[in-house]
Amino acid sequence: KELYGITTIMNYSGMEEMMKVQAVTDVGRERSVNQDYVYYSLTETGSLPNLFLVADGMGGHKAGDMASRYTVETFVSLVQDSTLKDPVSIINNAVTQVNRRLLQKAAESEDYEGMGTTLVAATVYDNILRVANVGDSRLYILGNEITQITRDHSLVEEMVSMGEINREQTRNHEKKNIITRAIGG
């Protein structure tokens, strides 16, 4: 199984010289296990000057917590070992490879069958933000205002794009948690 349209790469010029990073995860009200996994480094990771990752295991599927942890740890390893120099190529390659590896891992055991996760990967290289996202985890930039950078890969986002519902209706829509792309799954 290959990802279709695996990434959305965006250039966001004018990043501040000084970045502040904060990561907070929360198990939420409906789950007993936190399926979020976060990694960030403000120093070099492989050929990238910095790296930011967020993965959220797919709730309702097996081993979502394992899928998010495995995805982030494997992604970091792939970036560290990459011989590529272009940041977009490095990120694209890591997304493709981590998807393949997670699918292989899922095939090893019934306990992992169907496991998957969302992923946001970002780096600031030459003062330009490069972002890849799969699923409905989001990247925001905080400045004078909060700006959502990524576009959700979800059924309700597609419905908004086609004019079937408006943005406000997505909040309580019965299909709001159906994603159209994932790592693994």
Regions found by a protein language model. Give the residues of each.
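PP2C/PPM-type serine/threonine phosphatase catalytic domain
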Residues: 2-185
